[in-house]
Each structure stands twice: as C-alpha cells, then as structure tokens.
Amino acid sequence: MIETKPIDGKAFAAGLRARIAEEVAVLVRDHDLKPGLAVVLVGEDPASQVYVRNKAAQTAEAGMASFEYKLPADTAEADLLALVEKLNADPAVNGILVQLPLPAHLDSMKVLAAIDPAKDVDGFHVVNAGRLAVGLDALVPCTPLGCVMLLKHHLGNLSGLNAVVVGRSNIVGKPAAQLLLREDCTVTIAHSRTRDLPGMCRQADILVAAVGRPEMVRGDWIKPGATVIDVGINRVPKADGKTRLVGDVAYEEALGVAGLITPVPGGVGPMTIACLLQNTLTAARRQKGL
C-alpha cells in the first residue's frame, strides 16, 4: 500500500501571503504604490459574506488597500454597471472583484464583461480567458492558479505528465487545463458525459476533480501513486443533522492509492484568496509598467 501524503494548502498559502506582503512593502517604499482591491457584494448570501470578510482581512494583512461595496439585493443592473465603471476609472483600485453568484435579475456575464480586463483579478473576463488560451500573459482564475502552484511546488517539473481535469467550467476546469498545457502536460478534459470516466481517470498522473459532486471520484478511479487535486467543496448531512465538508474525491478511499492528495478542507481552498492577492499585486505592477 502506498503512503499517501496530504498536500497542506493552508501552510503553502500562508507562505505565499507572507511573500506577497514583503513585495507589497517594497512597492510602497520604492514606488509609493499601495495595491488596492475593490470587492463588490450584492445581496445577503451568507457564504459570500464570510468569503468577502476573509478577503478584506487578508488584503489588509498583506499591506494592500481594501475597498468594500455592499449593495442591496434589489440593486438595478445599471447602478451596478455604473459602480464598475467608477472603479475602472479609479487609479487607487488595481483589482476589481464582483462576488458571485449575483441575484437572479442581474446578468453576470454582462457585469463581468464591464470590468477593465487589466483590473479583472478573478480572471473571468473573456479577454483574459482568450489571452490564457493563446499563451499570452493574463490574469488567471485564482483557484486553478493555486492548483498549479501546489503541483509545481510538490512535483517540480510537470512536463510530459498525463493530467486529467474532471470538470469543464470557465472558473476552474477550462483554465486549469490551459495552465497544465502551459506546463507541457498532456491534458484531457473529462466531464459528466465522458465515456468510461473511471478508466480515463486511471490514466492520470495528475487528477484534478472539479465537478461539484460529493465524493464522485472513487478510490479505484485513481492510478496508484498519482497526485490528486480535489477542488470540490460540498456540504453533506451527518447523522446528527449537522453537515460536514467533503470534496469531489472519496478521500478515505484515496488514502493508500494516491501519492499526494489535497484534503477538503485545507487543501485548495486557502490558495484561492492567496492567489487573488497575487493577481492584485500582478495587476498593480502591470498598470504602473513595473
């Protein structure tokens, strides 16, 4: 049986945030440039509120300026777009993030398209998606960026490895595949319609699970010794009526088969905000020509 090592995303993210804070201090000292991140929250979604609170705390901890805009759930689309335009024009704001999901009456794609691509620190704008696809410098979605950072840290050179990404979302699956291609992996994108999904997964040296289905990837889907990146965050009921967090991979089954695996929680999750700060720092530098 293989001894499976958990990948500690929390520790890696803490180190990344510390390095970002050092770089921000140098920017402030040498260029009088304090990177600024604006976060826009529409409505009262509890999970979004917690996430925004965490973002604000970590932004301040990194020495960046944090701007929060909390709008009521019934905000008109024109008013939200006007705020985005105002932030696009504000030189103190280097990164703009509109927290998703938006209330149903707002067109998410239209709102995201209104953000200046140079300030699109979520990496969701079609310009950034297109730049990533053709191999140009782009602001990249935070979660897949964090996944690839963890992979490079633990595996070193990824060139030639077979990578299977289960999930084809614009937020994780597609950009993760693009980033792995950039590292010279041989990449397969699989999804719910893939024929013989377990067999496809068994070919993977790197298996990225990003489908949003609790424990869908079973232990016998994993190639012995493979590295498993579990992006899923799912709440499932416990016998006592409470809930627990699980990923898209059956973690207990993966132990003894995978070589490395990200646990849920504590794996990929902490990397997302750290990479948001990295993107804000990158955006600030590019806007100032540094």
UniProtKB/Swiss-Prot annotation:
Gene Ontology cellular-component terms listed: cytosol
GO MF annotations in UniProt: methenyltetrahydrofolate cyclohydrolase activity; methylenetetrahydrofolate dehydrogenase (NADP+) activity
One of the Pfam families matching this protein, by short name: THF_DHG_CYH_C
Catalysis: reaction(s): (6R)-5,10-methylene-5,6,7,8-tetrahydrofolate + NADP(+) = (6R)-5,10-methenyltetrahydrofolate + NADPH; (6R)-5,10-methenyltetrahydrofolate + H2O = (6R)-10-formyltetrahydrofolate + H(+)
Pathway(s): One-carbon metabolism; tetrahydrofolate interconversion
UniProt cross-references to Gene3D superfamilies, sorted A to Z: Leucine Dehydrogenase, chain A, domain 1, NAD(P)-binding Rossmann-like Domain
UniProt-listed Enzyme Commission number(s): 1.5.1.5, 3.5.4.9
Disulfide bond entries: none
Keyword annotations: Amino-acid biosynthesis, Histidine biosynthesis, Hydrolase, Methionine biosynthesis, Multifunctional enzyme, NADP, One-carbon metabolism, Oxidoreductase, Purine biosynthesis
UniProt record, GO biological process: L-histidine biosynthetic process; methionine biosynthetic process; purine nucleotide biosynthetic process; tetrahydrofolate interconversion
Binding site for NADP(+): G167, R168, S169, S192, I233
Top-level lineage group: Bacteria
Cross-referenced InterPro entries: Aminoacid_DH-like_N_sf, NAD(P)-bd_dom_sf, THF_DH/CycHdrlase, THF_DH/CycHdrlase_cat_dom, THF_DH/CycHdrlase_CS, THF_DH/CycHdrlase_NAD-bd_dom
Function of the protein: Catalyzes the oxidation of 5,10-methylenetetrahydrofolate to 5,10-methenyltetrahydrofolate and then the hydrolysis of 5,10-methenyltetrahydrofolate to 10-formyltetrahydrofolate.
PANTHER family reported for this sequence: C-1-TETRAHYDROFOLATE SYNTHASE, CYTOPLASMIC (PTHR48099:SF5), C-1-TETRAHYDROFOLATE SYNTHASE, CYTOPLASMIC-RELATED (PTHR48099)
Subunit and partners: Homodimer.
NCBIfam families in alphabetical order: PRK10792.1, PRK14186.1, PRK14188.1
HAMAP family the UniProt entry points to: THF_DHG_CYH (MF_01576)
Protein family (similarity comment): Belongs to the tetrahydrofolate dehydrogenase/cyclohydrolase family.
Protein's name in the database: Bifunctional protein FolD
Organism, scientific name: Azorhizobium caulinodans (strain ATCC 43989 / DSM 5975 / JCM 20966 / LMG 6465 / NBRC 14845 / NCIMB 13405 / ORS 571)
